[in-house]
Amino acid sequence: MSDFPSWHIVGDWFDNCSCAVPCPCTFAQAPDNGFCESVLFWHVREGYYGDVKLDNLSFVRVGRWEGDLWARQATVVAGLYIDDHADDRQMEALPMIIGGRAGGFPGWVNECFAGGRKSRGIERAQITYEIAPDLGHWGVDIIGKVKAWAKAIGGPTSPPGKYPQLINAPGSETGPGPQVVTWGKSTILSVDAHGFKFEYTLNSAKHIPFDWVGP
């Protein structure tokens, strides 16, 4: 990894996918029905890639994988959208990180796709997102392409304003460490982007912070 500069990004991640609640992937299990169709979202609050600042940038991955990711038996096809206010250097840096080429936790995840990875491209897009301060809801829109929103799960025995969370997740999608998973359920998941077209409601969603360094 000596050909890559040092980098560090910190922020929020959430997903909205085809699996039932709770998502088995977070427990290091194979996805429901052997596949996962999903929207993955990242917002970088602070970050850099060498001398390229990455503060306040968002990106969205739409795709499908088949097989058990954590058993390193998965195959994935995906496309990426990056904030339309990213400049050319930022557009080059973010795919290096998320694609795993620049190491860190994404590099480790890249090795889990032993069946292969296929990219359907990278595009700029106007990305609108919201994450409630209390993590009661979260979501992202890319007009005409992606709509993925969720609410944190509550129930008859939940204290008001308190949502189910998990620590020490065996399959945390943002890696090992002190990350806290907040469980949610989708209110809408609609994708017509990068050749994917799918819709789900009342399926799995979750929010997890991330703090990644590399290479």
State where each predicted segment sits.
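Extended, charged low-complexity segments
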Residues: 153-215
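Charged linear interaction tracts used for macromolecular binding and regulation
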Residues: 76-166, 172
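Low-complexity, flexible helical/coil segments
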Residues: 51-58, 115-120, 176-180
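N-terminal ordered "arm"
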Residues: 2-49
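Aromatic- and glycine-enriched beta-alpha-beta binding-site module
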Residues: 34-107
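Short amphipathic beta-strand and strand-loop transition segments with alternating hydrophobic
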Residues: 25, 62-65, 125-132
